[in-house]
C-alpha cells in the first residue's frame, strides 16, 4: 500500500536574501561605452518549491487509477550563494544605428553555472519611432541536486527534478517598436505620453519548452 511517510514537509517557510552589487561604467570615446558589474547574493530559508514532486528509482511505484503518486517533494539546501559577473558594451554606429551587447557569467554553490549573451540593434526610423531586433543566447550546466524522473535515490539528502535547474540551452529572438516624445504632444486625460513600447519575443529551449511573449509599456507624465 502507498504510504507517503517519506514526505518531508518544510517547517521553515521564510526566505531572506542579501545582495551586494558593484559596477563600473566608462565612456571610452564618442562612440563607445563600457560597463561591468559583479553581484554577490546570499539566500537563506525555504529555497525548495513544495509543489515539485519527486519519484525515486528505488521505491515501488504507486498509482490511483492511471495517476502515479509521488514519493516526496523537492528537497534543497536552505542556503544558496550566487555570483553573477557581466558587462555591457554599446557602440554608436551612426545616427540611425546603435549596437548594444551584453554578456554575463553566473555561478552558485548548487553547482549551476551559465553564460548569457545578447545583442540588440536599434534602428531609428524617425525622431520618434525606433525598431529594435534582438537575439539572446543562454546555456546552463545543471545543479548537482538535479536528476530526471525516477533517477533519484531515496537515500539522497537533497533532490530536485525541476528542469529549470537542469542542463539546457535557450534561444530568444525578438522585435520591438518604440515611440518616444520628449515634448509629450500626445495626451491621455491629464497625462502626457512620453514613451510607448511594444515587444514580441519567441523563446525556445533545448528541453522542448517554447514560448511567445508580448509586452507593452507606456510612460506618462502628469500635466501640471
Where are these regions (language model features)?
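Generic detector of bulky aromatic hydrophobic side chains
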Residues: 1-3, 8, 19, 23, ...
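Outer membrane beta-barrel transmembrane domains
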Residues: 41, 47-79, 84-88, 107-118, ...
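Outer-membrane beta-barrel channels and translocator barrels
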Residues: 27-31, 94-96, 126-128, 182-184, ...
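Short beta-strand-to-coil "C-cap" segments at the C-terminal boundary of structured domains/repeats
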Residues: 218-224
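General secondary-structure edge motif
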Residues: 4, 12, 16, 69-70, ...
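Solenoidal tandem-repeat scaffolds enriched in leucines and small polar residues
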Residues: 1-53
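Face-selective signature of the C-terminal outer-membrane beta-barrel domain
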Residues: 27-38, 81-92, 97-102, 195-201
Amino acid at each position: 500500500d502507498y504510504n507517503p511517510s517519506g514526505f518531508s514537509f518544510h517547517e521553515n517557510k521564510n526566505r531572506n536574501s542579501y545582495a551586494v552589487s558593484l559596477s563600473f561604467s566608462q565612456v571610452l570615446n564618442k562612440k563607445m561605452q563600457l560597463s561591468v558589474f559583479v553581484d554577490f547574493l546570499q539566500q537563506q530559508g525555504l529555497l525548495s518549491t513544495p509543489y515539485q514532486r519527486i519519484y525515486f528509482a528505488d521505491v515501488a511505484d504507486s498509482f490511483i487509477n492511471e495517476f502515479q503518486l509521488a514519493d516526496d517533494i523537492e528537497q534543497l539546501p536552505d542556503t544558496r550563494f550566487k555570483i553573477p559577473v557581466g558587462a555591457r558594451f554599446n557602440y554608436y554606429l551612426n545616427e540611425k544605428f546603435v549596437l548594444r551587447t551584453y554578456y554575463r557569467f553566473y555561478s552558485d554553490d548548487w553547482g549551476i553555472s551559465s553564460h548569457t549573451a545578447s545583442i540588440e540593434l536599434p534602428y531609428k526610423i524617425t525622431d520618434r519611432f525606433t525598431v529594435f531586433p534582438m537575439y539572446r543566447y543562454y546555456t546552463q550546466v545543471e545543479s548537482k541536486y538535479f536528476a530526471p524522473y525516477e533517477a533519484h535515490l531515496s537515500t539522497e539528502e537533497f533532490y530536485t527534478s525541476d528542469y529549470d535547474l537542469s542542463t539546457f540551452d535557450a534561444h530568444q529572438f525578438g522585435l520591438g517598436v518604440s515611440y518616444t516624445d520628449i515634448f509629450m504632444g500626445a495626451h491621455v486625460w491629464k497625462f502626457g505620453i512620453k514613451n510607448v513600447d511594444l515587444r514580441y519575443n519567441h523563446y525556445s529551449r533545448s528541453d522542448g519548452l517554447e514560448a511567445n511573449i508580448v509586452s507593452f509599456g507606456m510612460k506618462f507624465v502628469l500635466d501640471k
